[in-house]
Amino acid sequence: MNQTTRKNGYVGGALTFAVLATIMFALYVAGKVAGMDQAAIAFAEAIRSEIGTAFFRLVTILGGGMFLVPVAVMMIAVLYIKKYRVEAMFVLISLGVSEVANELLKLFFARPRPSGVNLVELPESFSFPSGHAMIGPAFYCMVAFWIAQWFAEKRWSSLVQPAVFIFVALLAFSRVYLGVHYVSDVLTGFFLSMCWYFLLRLGYEEWMGRRSTVVDPIPHSR
């Protein structure tokens, strides 16, 4: 796949998820999300079990700030030391922009969180859109992309990105299962995160492309 085709794919992916997010915003503003929210709550209640609750409590931790911040700090430090400085910058951009955008959107819409069954402590922040669904997925997908790229000669490398996509979908769903978000919160956040992921991929490709035209590229050197 040539560079132009890849870039077109990133733009197409970003636009697709931007449209989906816009639809969710429009449905929320129009008050048309109650049906899907109640259906998702009913589904989550129907499938709850002790094992499922333990599993999703673990999964949801991996998308929270208490986990992502120290992991990101360590990643940035290691990448910088190993001279993967472009990647270190993109880790910071990925999480920083997502966090700020999510907080601003939460404050703007000021949607209360679900009441009733909360299987983890209910966060004090507003509900729409979900921070776990908006911040973690783009970060994890970028990391998966780099791992698949750096270890392309390994047989398992082709499985990394599909496996991570399944994980981030479970991460997003965990918020509904645990009763701390409506599904409309989660879908909106997830669509925004995937849009941001494709924009990050596009930005990364552009940045690396410009560098290769200035200096002779050295494999695995930044």
Language-model regions: role of each:
Residues 25, 41, 102-106, 110, ...:
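Membrane-water interface at transmembrane helix exits
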Residues 62-81, 137-143, 147:
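Hydrophobic alpha-helical transmembrane segments
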Residues 10-14, 86-94, 156-163, 188:
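Alpha-helical transmembrane segments of integral membrane proteins
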Residues 1-67, 107-109, 113-120:
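N-terminal transmembrane-helix/juxtamembrane module of multi-pass inner/ER membrane proteins
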Residues 34, 82-152:
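Membrane-interface loops
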Residues 18, 91, 95-99, 190, ...:
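Alpha-helical transmembrane spans of integral membrane proteins, capturing the lipid-embedded, hydrophobic core
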Residues 20-23, 96-101, 166-176:
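Aromatic-anchored segments of alpha-helical transmembrane domains
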Residues 119-222:
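Membrane-embedded catalytic cores of phosphoryl/pyrophosphoryl-handling enzymes
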